[in-house]
């Protein structure tokens, strides 16, 4: 792992949380810093998940510091699964760390699947978070309600696979159309080919992510070959 990749242990409410921070070699004046949350801990979800990893590389290629971490009970993280309640505290711990590392820099909360459910919910209510990215929101899973997004007016990008087995396209379109007007105005929904995991189409997903961020932050650097570690 090179000098701008840092393996760390965050201070969490249930104990230490295993994490990796990728930061640009020149991090002075970065326009935002990102937390990226992984999929369901009970179904082999970790910060090394391929969707999470590719999204992290896309952020890194734009010069955005990105923090991935393992939720409680995953990998070397202490604690145990808490049905999303304690995992919200884990996200807050990650945001706290980024806020200390990059004072006064706006934060981006992002996540894939379960990680989107938890990460965006915390991000909607945290004043330090100015924008959100959700990948593969499993809205058909009634155990993971995304109703909070209906009133969340922070700028957000939601990227879905056209054949997501946990969120039918027509159902997702209806879901997003039911947002409050101010939330609709702040939300961009993009469908790309592929299933829930964007299998065979990760490049399309990351291209959408990059374009949205470059549109919002023209001062971001042009994409460069992303991290490989």
Predicted segment positions?
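N-terminal cap/lid segment of alpha/beta-hydrolase-fold proteins
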Residues: 1-29
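Catalytic histidine-centered segment of alpha/beta-hydrolase-like enzymes
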Residues: 79, 194-206
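Gly/Ala-rich beta-loop-alpha elbow adjacent to hydrolase catalytic centers
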Residues: 111-119
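Short beta-strand/loop motif that positions the catalytic acidic residue
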Residues: 152-153, 158-160, 164
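Catalytic histidine neighborhood in serine/cysteine hydrolases
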Residues: 178-197
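Acidic catalytic loop of the alpha/beta-hydrolase fold
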Residues: 162-167, 197
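Alpha/beta-hydrolase active-site loop
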Residues: 51, 81-101
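Short, surface-exposed "cap/lid" segments of acyl-processing enzymes
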Residues: 26-70
